[in-house]
Amino acid sequence: MKKTAIALLAWFVSSASLAATPWQKITHPVPGAAQSIGSFANGCIIGADTLPVQSDNYQVMRTDQRRYFGHPDLVMFIQRLSHQAQQRGLGTVLIGDMGMPAGGRFNGGHASHQTGLDVDIFLQLPKTRWSQAQLLRPQALDLVSRDGKHVVPSRWSSDIASLIKLAAQDNDVTRIFVNPAIKQQLCLDAGSDRGWLRKVRPWFQHRAHMHVRLRCPADSLECEDQPLPPPGDGCGAELQSWFEPPKPGTTKPEKKTPPPLPPSCQALLDEHVL
């Protein structure tokens, strides 16, 4: 468990030690009507909103990294979700990375989060608000066992399941990425109300947080949506395949060269980065 905790901490701070990308040189949102451009893993945003860091319902972690920008739809989703969580007595929602002022590629830690439509939310719901020191150096709570096959019972709670369900039931949300073991536990706990599980997708890591993705806004004409998740609750063979050992000869995919930016994003960089 100690090694896992160290790995999680390294994941959350890794970006601080890497070389900056051109997008990090843009320190304020680009003026204009809100437009998410390109794909979640290759895009940018014009007219991003700033998530207010002061709220009774949520707290923003690592504000020194300045990753609390997003499309107005994302800001409203966070406010909506955290209000619902407070109404139900779940606790304070802890907000992690959203995007940079103009979106674009991070220097580490994320492949997506580029169009202002993604947010990481800790799977912790403290009843006592965190101090500024805790928020600047958050301690991730690993919910998954060392073998990756199930959640840790002492760390899992119905409140966490309720938070994920609330997010999945939001009409603007298209996908929520969690660790396969977390998805498995949600499948076990869901009962007969299972429609929302379709949006909850198993993915690597994501042992302590959920990654919520919104659909492209209707007026963002250059935004590229993903196909909808497959029909059904996703609790069958697809989920179980995540727990099977790798097939013989399986190797890690080679790191790909980033594709060219959408023309509108390249033009934005050319105009705002010297």
Curated annotation (Swiss-Prot):
<dbReference type="GO" id="GO:0004252">
    <property type="term" value="F:serine-type endopeptidase activity"/>
</dbReference>
<dbReference type="GO" id="GO:0004222">
    <property type="term" value="F:metalloendopeptidase activity"/>
</dbReference>
<dbReference type="GO" id="GO:0046872">
    <property type="term" value="F:metal ion binding"/>
</dbReference>
<keyword id="KW-0574">Periplasm</keyword>
<feature type="binding site">
    <location>
        <position position="147"/>
    </location>
    <ligand>
        <name>Zn(2+) 2</name>
    </ligand>
</feature>
<feature type="binding site">
    <location>
        <position position="110"/>
    </location>
    <ligand>
        <name>Zn(2+) 1</name>
    </ligand>
</feature>
<dbReference type="Pfam" id="PF03411">
    <property type="entry name" value="Peptidase_M74"/>
</dbReference>
<dbReference type="GO" id="GO:0006508">
    <property type="term" value="P:proteolysis"/>
</dbReference>
<keyword id="KW-0645">Protease</keyword>
<feature type="binding site">
    <location>
        <position position="211"/>
    </location>
    <ligand>
        <name>Zn(2+) 1</name>
    </ligand>
</feature>
<dbReference type="InterPro" id="IPR009045">
    <property type="entry name" value="Hedgehog_sig/DD-Pept_Zn-bd_sf"/>
</dbReference>
<comment type="similarity">
    <text>Belongs to the peptidase M74 family.</text>
</comment>
<feature type="binding site">
    <location>
        <position position="120"/>
    </location>
    <ligand>
        <name>Zn(2+) 1</name>
    </ligand>
</feature>
<dbReference type="InterPro" id="IPR005073">
    <property type="entry name" value="Peptidase_M74"/>
</dbReference>
<keyword id="KW-0378">Hydrolase</keyword>
<feature type="binding site">
    <location>
        <position position="150"/>
    </location>
    <ligand>
        <name>Zn(2+) 2</name>
    </ligand>
</feature>
<feature type="binding site">
    <location>
        <position position="113"/>
    </location>
    <ligand>
        <name>Zn(2+) 1</name>
    </ligand>
</feature>
<comment type="subunit">
    <text>Dimer.</text>
</comment>
<comment type="function">
    <text>Murein endopeptidase that cleaves the D-alanyl-meso-2,6-diamino-pimelyl amide bond that connects peptidoglycan strands. Likely plays a role in the removal of murein from the sacculus.</text>
</comment>
<keyword id="KW-1015">Disulfide bond</keyword>
<keyword id="KW-0479">Metal-binding</keyword>
<keyword id="KW-0482">Metalloprotease</keyword>
<feature type="region of interest" description="Disordered">
    <location>
        <begin position="225"/>
        <end position="274"/>
    </location>
</feature>
<feature type="disulfide bond">
    <location>
        <begin position="216"/>
        <end position="223"/>
    </location>
</feature>
<keyword id="KW-0732">Signal</keyword>
<dbReference type="GO" id="GO:0000270">
    <property type="term" value="P:peptidoglycan metabolic process"/>
</dbReference>
<feature type="disulfide bond">
    <location>
        <begin position="187"/>
        <end position="235"/>
    </location>
</feature>
<feature type="signal peptide">
    <location>
        <begin position="1"/>
        <end position="19"/>
    </location>
</feature>
<protein>
    <recommendedName>
        <fullName>Penicillin-insensitive murein endopeptidase</fullName>
        <ecNumber>3.4.24.-</ecNumber>
    </recommendedName>
</protein>
<dbReference type="GO" id="GO:0030288">
    <property type="term" value="C:outer membrane-bounded periplasmic space"/>
</dbReference>
<feature type="disulfide bond">
    <location>
        <begin position="44"/>
        <end position="265"/>
    </location>
</feature>
<keyword id="KW-0862">Zinc</keyword>
